[in-house]
């Protein structure tokens, strides 16, 4: 009972900090987050506002890169998805540090698993294990890029990541020329509308395939 009381007190304090330290729009964005992401905010109060700002910037720039057609148009499982996650972790690492950035990435993936269990979609698709493994790989790539090159400018990060994607250093999900998901054997992935599966047959491949 004492532990529960302390936990509720902590939640109240954190909520008060969020209401007083963030604008109305930011508070709304907080409540749009998944449970694991909200918990990350609770445990990183002094970094969360920067994290939200960086995330908004990353989404804007990713949309701009998508409109240039320099990668592809697949916001889930494609090159532009790989760019988004690696760029997100790179910019977060520069802003709030590698450890906090990666822990936010993990919280996001936990949120995706919760969405899977509820049958909810992200970027038009229900999350699954191959997509989560892809995100995790690309998240780590972005964080490692900054660890090895901490002084890269934003433009240099963007160009380096695009080049790395073209060189096959990141990961995407295998597709047919028409855009359908393929297994590692090159066969179409069978989707059953009556069954939602976490461990699908989608195949993780280098980003230049």
Model region roles, listed by residue range:
Residues 8-17:
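Bacterial N-terminal signal peptides
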Residues 1-7:
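Bacterial N-terminal signal peptides that target proteins for export
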Residues 3, 20-209:
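Intrinsically disordered, low-complexity, mixed-charge
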């Amino acid at each position: 009972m004492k532990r529960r009381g302390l936990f509720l007190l902590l939640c109240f304090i954190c909520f008060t900090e969020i209401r007083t330290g963030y604008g109305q729009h930011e508070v709304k964005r907080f409540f749009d987050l998944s449970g694991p992401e909200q918990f990350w905010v609770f445990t990183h109060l002094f970094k969360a506002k920067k994290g939200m700002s960086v995330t908004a910037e990353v989404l804007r720039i990713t949309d701009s890169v998508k409109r240039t057609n320099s990668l592809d148009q697949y916001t889930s499982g494609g090159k532009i998805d790989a760019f988004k996650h690696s760029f997100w972790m790179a910019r977060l690492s520069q802003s709030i540090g590698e450890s906090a950035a990666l822990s936010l990435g993990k919280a996001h993936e936990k949120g995706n698993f919760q969405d899977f269990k509820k049958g909810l979609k992200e970027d038009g698709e229900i999350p699954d294990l191959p997509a989560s493994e892809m995100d995790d790989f690309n998240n780590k790539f972005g964080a490692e890029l900054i660890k090895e090159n901490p002084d890269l400018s934003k433009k240099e990060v963007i160009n380096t990541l695009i080049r790395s994607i073209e060189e096959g250093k990141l990961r995407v999900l295998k597709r047919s020329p028409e855009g359908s998901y393929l297994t590692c054997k090159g066969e179409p992935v069978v989707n059953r509308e009556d069954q939602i599966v976490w461990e699908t047959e989608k195949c993780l491949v280098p980003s230049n395939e």
